[in-house]
Amino acid sequence: MAPSQKALLVLVLSMLLTASDSRARRIDCTRFVYAPICRGVAAKRGGDSLSVGASTELDDALTDPFLRSEEPREEDTEKKWRELSRLSRVLQILLSHPTGETEQLDRLLTL
């Protein structure tokens, strides 16, 4: 092998080693947040997560009052029951009498 070929081979090998070494280094995303590797889905999938861990005590403190407010209260169910029975009476009267009696309908709706 000629000395120029050896020099060319060493140059190519050194370029390959430096290129592979520079690609292997990871960018510190805490310092370089706008680097392309630190943005988007690729950053979320790889490596360490910067998110805060789940706090179950805080979650419970926030969701418990909301869930309790969704439970039906006794006065709400009584009110709904009264409204349904009233609607049932109005429908029974309307179906049993011929149509065209607007005065009776107005009276029933104001009960």
Curated annotation (Swiss-Prot):
Residues 44-111 form a propeptide. GO terms for molecular function: toxin activity. GO terms for cellular component: extracellular region. Disulfide bonds join 29-38. It is found in: Secreted. It comes from the Eukaryota. Negative results: has no effect on six different human nAChR subtypes including alpha-1-beta-1-epsilon-delta-epsilon/CHRNA1-CHRNB1-CHRND-CHRNE, alpha-3-beta-2/CHRNA3-CHRNB2, alpha-3-beta-4/CHRNA3-CHRNB4, alpha-4-beta-2/CHRNA4-CHRNB2, alpha-7/CHRNA7 and alpha-9-alpha-10/CHRNA9-CHRNA10, when tested at 1 uM. May mimic the function of prey elevenin neuropeptide. In vivo, intracranial injection in mice induces hyperactivity. Monomer. This is Elevenin.
